[in-house]
Amino acid sequence: MNKQVRQSKIREMLHLHEVGNQHDLIRLLEEAGIRVAQATLSRDCSELGIIRSKGLNGYRLALPEENPGNIIKGLVEVEVLSIQSNEAVIIIKTLPGRAHGVGSFLDQLKNSQILGTIAGDDTVLVIPVSVAQISQVISYIQENLSKN
């Protein structure tokens, strides 16, 4: 199946159903006649920017445009435990399993001072464009994690 058609169907499923996890999404896609491997679905979800969001009946998968920025900021703030740096990089410690979401959130901000992020299970490595601007990048990250 064509990637664009599959991703369009994924968007449609997320708009029509409260999907709790990727396993449920695979089941819905199969019911619609679309067979997809879990690894392929995971890549599609990443490319589409799909995140876990608090819904009426618990957490669900959601497209980024369904979530106002302040809600995402609030969720990310709860997941961040600490922000530290040395003279070269910034390290963000998160709750277990939440580093990818925090890293993706920072990537979506597209700040020109951030060269890139690398996320593990509970740690995000933030690489600034210039080490001379680490304090400004930390301030920017803190501002964008605040609920205000």
From Swiss-Prot:
Keywords attached to this Swiss-Prot or TrEMBL record, sorted alphabetically, are: Amino-acid biosynthesis, Arginine biosynthesis, Cytoplasm, DNA-binding, Repressor, Transcription, Transcription regulation
Q: Name one GO cellular component term.
A: cytoplasm
Task: Enumerate the transmembrane spans.
Answer: none
**Where does this protein act, in terms of pathway?**
Amino-acid biosynthesis; L-arginine biosynthesis [regulation]
Q: Name one GO biological process term.
A: L-arginine biosynthetic process
- Provide a Gene Ontology MF annotation, just one: arginine binding
Q: Where in the cell is it found?
A: Cytoplasm
Q: Does the keyword Cytoplasm apply?
A: yes
Protein's job: Regulates arginine biosynthesis genes.
Q: Which family does it belong to?
A: Belongs to the ArgR family.
Q: What is this protein called?
A: Arginine repressor
